[in-house]
Curated annotation (Swiss-Prot):
SUPFAM superfamilies per the UniProt record, alphabetical: C-terminal domain of ProRS, Class II aaRS ABD-related, Class II aaRS and biotin synthetases
Protein name per the record: Proline--tRNA ligase
GO BP field: prolyl-tRNA aminoacylation
Record keyword Aminoacyl-tRNA synthetase present: yes
Role summary: Catalyzes the attachment of proline to tRNA(Pro) in a two-step reaction: proline is first activated by ATP to form Pro-AMP and then transferred to the acceptor end of tRNA(Pro). Can inadvertently accommodate and process cysteine.
Enzyme Commission number(s) from the entry: 6.1.1.15
Chain's gene name: proS
PROSITE patterns, A to Z: AA_TRNA_LIGASE_II
GO molecular function, one term: ATP binding
Organism: Borreliella burgdorferi (strain ATCC 35210 / DSM 4680 / CIP 102532 / B31)
Amino acid sequence: MSDFIASKEDDYSKWYLDIVQKAKLADYSPVKGCMVIMPYGYSIWSKIQSILDKKFKETGHENAYFPMLIPYSFLEREKDHIDGFSPEFAIIKDAGGESLAEPLVLRPTSETIIWNMYSKWIKSYRDLPLKINQWANVVRWEKRTRPFLRTTEFLWQEGHTAHATEEEALEETLLILDVYKRFIEDYLAIPVFCGKKSEKEKFAGAVSTYSIEALMQDKKALQAATSHYLGLNFAKAFDVKFQDKDGKMRHVFASSWGVSTRLIGALIMVHSDEKGLVLPPRIAPIEIIVIPIFKKEDEINKKILDYSDCVVDALKKAEFRVEIDKDVRSSPGFRFSSAEFKGIPIRLEVGINDVLLNSVTISRRDKDRKFKYQISLDSLISKVKVELDLMQKDLFQRALNFRILNTKEIFRSSKDSYETFKAYVNDYSGFVLSCWCGSLNCENIIKNETKATIRCIPDDFKARDLTGMTCIYCSSKAKYFVLFAKSY
């Protein structure tokens, strides 16, 4: 175990906070519940942003920006929406030394301000579909906060789309869910379950919500992304109508969807270890760190440094994200540990022996410290690419193996009962696949007795036959296979 961070097994929460602070991802701000995202943490968010932004544009979305100050009356127009968010509102009642005629709410989410504008912009079927994304901050007055996972203010993207038909809006909702799934699995190397939320767990103001659920190393679930089908709810609340091809006036159908800096928390909790942060290569701000191993002689050090610069130049020319650590005051061991703590995927060591042999020594962040070998400069680019690709795949497979190991099926039978289910969730946690009758009462009782919620009705198990299956709690006829878990 590192001297610098808590043991993951002994104190998971402190281990997580140690990595956040000591890897310089974020720090606490003077405002309770808020965080300062430090440059290294923000560089991860910037990478997430750039990849997703490209994917949104490829699917026909444009970026815009809407005010963070929302008239309170806008939020009152959609009853379920205000009921769901009002406990978290931050409200401004005074400004400029005077009381405001109407209170303003700091943006908890932007459906209302955006749909107010859509009522001005959408008049004809020619204006549809309208597909806008916004990169912004939001404020939700959370009582229990933790950096990246749940903070009073956080960064996110939120997409808001308007469509002529219900089919188009539903297609958009599921399209974006798939974009998120592919991004989280392919770039963050986090295996996920996708599925529909229960009525209790859906977004306030949505007809239906679809979520992406991941399993952290402490066996708690984390909601990594959501996509909502809003139906006509916001179009009716803000009277957004269009004239169709037959000249009839009709309300538009809607979707909204988003991910946030919570994804950085997921990266930490899925991949990191007691040496610090572990970042999948495709999302790492720095893919490769070159560390010259200096000697006492200046002449030798100059040769090592010149050679190291050539290595860096070759890697940059091949478009790798690479940095060099030229710190002559710190020992190689200290610099190795520093690179490990930051989660840099590949470390290249350059000593005088490497210079003489025209080689470098390569090691990987996700491997044991004994894993290292020399490669010739001629094969540098190909070998680095191979190791980066392998690390990306290995991290995903390791996380998938962990999820498989910690996903248990418990159904009512002669062997298992609700008591079996309850004991397992309370003692062990992880994902539990079970059956549910659809009753809110059963859902509430299970949550109260186990602290586990229905994470989603998973797509992976839609094809399974429910014939003869009964609700894990009440033994009534089952309507759904569902995933239960304790969660963040």
